[in-house]
Amino acid sequence: MRGNRLVEFPDDFWIPIPLDTNNVTALSPFLVPQDHLGSPTIFYSMSALMFVLFVAGTAINLLTIACTLQYKKLRSHLNYILVNMAVANLIVASTGSSTCFVCFAFKYMVLGPLGCKIEGFTAALGGMVSLWSLAVIAFERWLVICKPLGNFVFKSEHALLCCALTWVCGLCASVPPLVGWSRYIPEGMQCSCGPDWYTTGNKFNNESFVMFLFCFCFAVPFSIIVFCYSQLLFTLKMAAKAQADSASTQKAEKEVTRMVVVMVVAFLVCYVPYASFALWVINNRGQTFDLRLATIPSCVSKASTVYNPVIYVLLNKQFRLCMKKMLGMSADEDEESSTSQSTTEVSKVGPS
């Protein structure tokens, strides 16, 4: 077997396993099925998974956007960021998951080098915007409930500014590989594209880009989420102590605590695989690894287009009620009254 150190690869792909040929073009992920990387069962199973994520992710995020447009009461400035996240998720589902479904079915990157860059960029942009939207959601809730700025009123223009900020952050993280700082290449089983996590010591300066992503797109937003939600929980517990006789306040405090735990865990499930894999590659330069494992971070990230809307939208009683009406399903009167009551309770929380 010949190691990759002895094989010179083109700039548009790299295969991080030993190869038994000098003619790497014959194994190009843009030209031939990658049967040497895994059995057909693995490729077809991944194709089926990507199809499910494409259909479910597209449907749930389109429904979120359509529901917001139809029902005026959902067009609250505090819901702007949820719609912003739905748009970002829709980009990932419609470009990333759909193309992966096709490519895994053919067992190679049928889009070619240019299509790979486009798919990698759009999926990265949508993913980064969604990631920063989670941090903004935490920040907005901290700002509104904990009131660290006193009588500051969070208005529509502030919400729009926060949404715009997520796209600026997303572009800062997704544009560099297009202009020479890292690059977009086929990743994992070579049927999806993303930033080059694999190669080191070359003209693309991948190590510095990976560290930039780890700090700017993982450590910073995660710190924001942990800080804001910990402050929010502290405020709620203080309010619950002050209203110890109020069963509804105690119930609201428990529900919010449970939701915060779910939100933080969901963030970690989505982005820890990418972060840990990138750091492992940097600290184990030149080591080969199982490409099936390298495919996991991309799959988990694309799955977030489904489970994040479930957590942030479908578990929102107001959104859920409107979606039921939009789909012609009977709305539960108890649920509607519960929605109104929970909204009232939340509005009472926080320092006066």
UniProtKB/Swiss-Prot annotation:
Mod. after translation: Phosphorylated on some or all of the serine and threonine residues present in the C-terminal region.
Cytoplasmic topological domain residue ranges: 68-79, 140-158, 237-258, 316-352
Coarse class of the protein's main subcellular location: membrane
Disulfide bonding pattern of the chain: C116-C193
Residues that span the membrane, as ranges: 43-67, 80-105, 120-139, 159-182, 209-236, 259-282, 291-315
Gene3D superfamilies listed in its UniProt record: Rhodopsin 7-helix transmembrane proteins (1.20.1070.10)
Superkingdom of origin: Eukaryota
Tissue-specific expression: The color pigments are found in the cone photoreceptor cells.
Entry membrane topology: Multi-pass membrane protein
InterPro entries cross-referenced by the UniProt entry: GPCR_opsins, GPCR_Rhodpsn, GPCR_Rhodpsn_7TM, Opsin, Opsin_blue, Retinal_BS
Glycosylation site list: N23, N206
Chain positions with N6-(retinylidene)lysine modification: K302
GO BP terms: cellular response to light stimulus; G protein-coupled receptor signaling pathway; phototransduction; visual perception
Chain residue ranges for the region called Disordered: 332-352
GO molecular function: G protein-coupled photoreceptor activity
PANTHER family: OPSIN
Function: Visual pigments are the light-absorbing molecules that mediate vision. They consist of an apoprotein, opsin, covalently linked to cis-retinal.
Family: Belongs to the G-protein coupled receptor 1 family. Opsin subfamily.
Protein name (Swiss-Prot/TrEMBL): Blue-sensitive opsin
Organism field: Oryzias latipes (Japanese rice fish)
The organism's taxonomic lineage, starting at the top: Eukaryota, Metazoa, Chordata, Craniata, Vertebrata
